[in-house]
Amino acid sequence: MKDDNLICSVCGAVLDGEHIHEFDGQLMCEQCLDEHTVVCDNCHERIWRDNAEGDSLSTLCSHCYQYCYTTCERCGVLIRNDDAYYEDDDDVPYCYDCYRKLEESAIKSYNYKPDPIFYGSGNLFYGVELEIDKGGEENENAERLLDIANIREERIYCKHDGSISDGFEIVSHPMSLDYHINSMNWRDVFNEAVAMDYRSHNTATCGLHIHCSRSALGKDKEKQEETVSRIVYFVEKHWNELVKFSRRTPDNLNRWAARYATISNTSKETYKKAKDKNLGRYVTVNLENHYTVEFRLFRGTLRYKTFIAALQLVDEICRCAVNMSDKEMEELSWSDFVLRILPKKAELIEYLKSKRLYVNEIEAESEEM
């Protein structure tokens, strides 16, 4: 066959002998080769243009794109794996510019998790995650809160949270209840947040999550599991009272802090059924964390007394679960539970009264923020 009888497989033109190109088993003219194929910037293999990966700056074959490159989580730019930056204990990739901004940013990424610093004494420590909204996801605003809370040492940090429309999450290092009340200046932090137009209760997005150290719940894993089973049983048994305490709407609870709905005659059976459901972390008592048990029950608040009352309630539940037997916990009525609360937990008692949850005594209810 003569060269002048060869046909371009793409456009059908008769091929000139000096401009015949073969690619992927097909003969092509030079114009079609340029229009329909490209060369991978990484391995320099030619590929069909329609199969090319990459971005406006890089052209890659599928293999190089999958195994040699990744995408910056923050800005979406394509980066080589060797050029990606990661925060500690995190597998989310960033380009250098975004990584530097994150390191300098007052609002850290959602996956940011520094080594915990424990404040206070005793065995029971509580870390809080408080979501605030409506005031903007502004580093300057976060810095103002950090300056108030972290005068001498880092006690809180701020994080991005995709569930929040126009704000961020305040996270504390683990603290004893006494430290939260008497040493941590939460009232000043909340007042400043409100002054910057943030809200927590008066939103459709915000929650207050309280983490309790698992190590305080028993001397070994078996004892800790027994204590956790009593916690889950208590929450299931007294669900109606706790929902009223939480201030969450039914829809909000179902989405962010669902009930296990596994109440049985014993705490162990209730706990087993709860775990068997595999509901993940969006449940009232989240069991997914290795080092903590997370209470996700509460709606967010920037009212100091409500915040402290929630901490005191979690502390009371945990102490009952640690110190009581299964039988004692299973027989504990709500009225007996609230009557156990010592007068020093004044915020909790006042809040229970305001919600008509304290032996029928009523206290005037204050406005939430």
Q: Where do the protein language model's features map onto the residues?
A:
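Helical (often loop-to-helix) elements that flank the catalytic cores of nucleotide-handling enzymes
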Residues: Y179-F190, A216-S246, R303-C318, Y351-E365, ...
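Short Cys/His-rich "knuckle" micro-motifs
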Residues: E18-H21, V39, D50-E53, T71, ...
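Histidine-centered divalent-metal-coordination microenvironment in nucleic-acid enzymes
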Residues: S165-E169, H201-L217, T292-R296
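Zinc-coordinating Cys/His ligand positions in small cysteine/histidine-rich zinc-finger domains
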Residues: D16, M28-C32, W48-R49, S58-Y69, ...
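Terminal catalytic/cofactor-binding subdomain
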Residues: P93-D197
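Aromatic/basic-lined ligand-recognition segments
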Residues: G127, E225-T301
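Flexible helix-coil linker/hinge segments at domain or subdomain boundaries
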Residues: H201, N240-N254, R319-E350
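Short cysteine-rich clusters marking metal-coordination/redox-active sites
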Residues: C8-C11, C29, C40-C43, C61, ...
